[in-house]
A protein has these predicted regions:
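Intrinsic structural disorder
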Residues: 1-12, 80, 178, 245
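N-terminal auxiliary segments of SAM/dcSAM-dependent transferases
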Residues: 2-36
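Polar/charged alpha-helical tracts
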Residues: 17, 21-24, 34-41, 131-132, ...
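Short, flexible helical or helix-coil boundary motifs
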Residues: 19-26, 30, 39, 46-47, ...
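Short, solvent-exposed beta-strand-terminating loops
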Residues: 29-40, 187, 197
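Class I SAM-dependent transferase core
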Residues: 37-63
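S-adenosylmethionine/decaboxylated-SAM
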Residues: 55-59, 66-264
Length: 264
């Protein structure tokens, strides 16, 4: 259902067209893009730990605020009824995604709602949060690796329980190229035409260090390189990188990390 048609107007349409024009200018504004990169370096992983300063509904989100804003836009436009997050941490992401789907459900834009989490370690304090937080009580979490068969079966079973599923995947677990590429290979086939996969922390490729976390990942071995490899596969050729999202954000932890399934 395109709810935008209910309240659309020539003025709103014109405003959205202007957004597209502004994004194009920002994308081609070398100085703006360079300032964004420099700011990320100052705020990044090993400097101020800036992303650790924000909460969603009282839970650490560990996200740049503008990245959350653009995810809200993706969710509103795509209207998924299943969201799967790989890498749970504190659970702030799960709270965010479930609250967004609760809004869609309340607005009668979706009739079913599921939010799933997968993490190699489902920590006790996170379990307590998810059990008691009003946005998280019906969230389901699987403890294990996102690329194990058991995790895949967990995702498949839950997706198949939804009528006409429209899953949105958020990959934010282990950030090595091989791991993320395997996640993409496993879960991309579930995504319908026009659907999205959000690959977090692609900024590691451009702002990370070769010895980060004991060289478990870094430039040349990152979520961004995983996307490049995946896009060369038969399944990957069905997707495109949503470059306009990176351009509009300027400051982002997921440059080139949003991929969209093409309509055939």
């Amino acid at each position: 259902m395109d709810i935008d048609q209910k309240y659309n107007s020539p003025e709103l349409g014109s405003f959205k067209e202007q957004i597209t024009q502004r994004i194009s200018k920002i994308k081609n504004h070398a100085e703006v893009q360079e300032v964004g990169k420099r700011l990320f370096d100052l705020l990044g992983y090993d400097q101020t730990m800036y992303v650790y300063n924000f909460l969603w509904a009282g839970i650490p989100s560990i996200q740049l605020p503008q990245d959350l804003m653009v995810k809200q836009e993706i969710i509103w436009d795509y209207q998924p009824n299943v969201i799967i997050e790989m890498g749970v941490a504190w659970g702030g992401g799960l709270a965010f995604y479930n609250s967004m789907l609760m809004l869609l459900e309340q607005s009668e834009l979706i009739t079913q709602r599921k939010v799933l989490g997968i993490d190699i370690e489902f920590r006790e304090h996170t379990q307590k949060i998810l059990k008691n937080h009003p946005f998280c009580k019906d969230v389901r979490v699987f403890e294990g690796s996102s690329i194990d068969l058991e995790a895949y079966d967990f995702v498949k079973t839950n997706i198949n329980e939804v009528d006409e599923p429209r899953p949105l995947f958020v990959l934010d677990s282990f950030h090595s190229m091989d791991h993320v590429k395997r996640e993409l290979e496993l879960y991309a086939p579930f995504v319908p035409e026009g659907g999205y996969i959000i690959v977090e922390d692609t900024a590691i490729e451009f702002h990370g260090k070769a010895d980060h976390k004991g060289a478990r990942w870094g430039p040349g071995n990152s979520p961004w390189t995983a996307i490049q490899k995946f896009m060369q596969t038969d399944e990957g050729e069905l997707f495109e990188v949503a470059d306009e999202i990176t351009a509009k954000l300027v400051l982002t932890g997921m440059p080139g990390g949003v991929i969209r399934k093409l309509k055939q």
